[in-house]
Amino acid sequence: MAKKLYDVVALGEVLIDFTQNGKSAQGNGLFEANPGGAPGNVLAMLNNLGKKTSFIGKVGNDQFGLMLKETLEGLGIGTENLMLDDEVRTTLAFVHTFEDGDRDFSFYRNPGADMMLRADEVQEELIQSARIFHFGTLSMTHDGVREATKKALDVAKASGVMISFDPNLREPLWKSLDEAKEQVLYGLQYTDILKISDNEIQWLTGEEDYTEGVKKIREMKDIPLILVSMGKEGSRAYYKDMIVEAKPFLQKNTIETTGAGDTFCANILNYVLDNGLENLTEEGLKEMLTFANAAASIITTKKGALKVMPTKADVEEFLANNG
């Protein structure tokens, strides 16, 4: 059995989120280039919590790709399986923020380098050396990277590595929502920890009620721990026959919600790394959700996500003032 060098290894996308940042003297909109991408955000938060992480994926050998590599390394995230593509450029996302802080995305990814990761480029021993393997569905939208993701899942499962899945559905990146659903259902078959949003669970299961949705998912695969993030309604954990809910922390100074779900997810994984997945209690789950909700709330007051994740001390201080 490979030695567990890493707490979490994630496969997927790192990209540049261009977020609105005021206007120029000429009245033109200014955009700030923020390193992002859901799996990268998750690892950045975990690193802030003292966990050892590494990223599997591909960026362009261009100014943005090199910036992302440098950013990950600066945060202490392993890049031994971050590939550089000489042909295809780094994926870009333009984030349009609404007044309540929610957002919409326009992607420049036709193709983007993250889609070009091949199965033969995935380092099996890296996955085998992790306690948790984490993935999403941006790495399942197109053939090449889909095969890389499936290979990684097979390696993780065969090696007894715990598998965490956040579908993170981005509709514009799929040929059709039917194809998206097919790939999410494929991913569920491997999953030990599922983080899913309120909208995603309703879309996936056709159930308005989240508990009914969870029942449907568990009929397909008995996933031990399912987290439903409900935005302004807080979050829920479904563990064995327990349902635990925690209220949100709503900020007056919310700027945008980019990275909130990833921050939440990372804090859940951190709790599982510290406490295991076998004997979680109602009290422990409530504490886990409360901490994760608080961390997610903090990130909504900042532009971008990957480089500005809160520390454990930030979250503890926030809870002391808002608990």
Regions found by a protein language model. Give the residues of each.
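Glycine-rich phosphate/adenosyl-contacting loop at the front of the ribokinase-like
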Residues: 1-78, 117
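Conserved phosphate-binding/catalytic region of the ribokinase-like
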Residues: 1-9, 154, 210-323
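Active-site metal-binding loops of divalent metal-dependent hydrolases
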Residues: 14, 138, 167, 263
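Conserved N-terminal subdomain of the carbohydrate kinase-like
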Residues: 52-135, 316-323
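Structural alpha-helical scaffold elements that stabilize or flank donor/cofactor-binding regions
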Residues: 125-126, 186-187, 219
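Conserved beta-alpha-beta core of the PfkB/ribokinase-like small-molecule kinase fold
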Residues: 140-216, 233
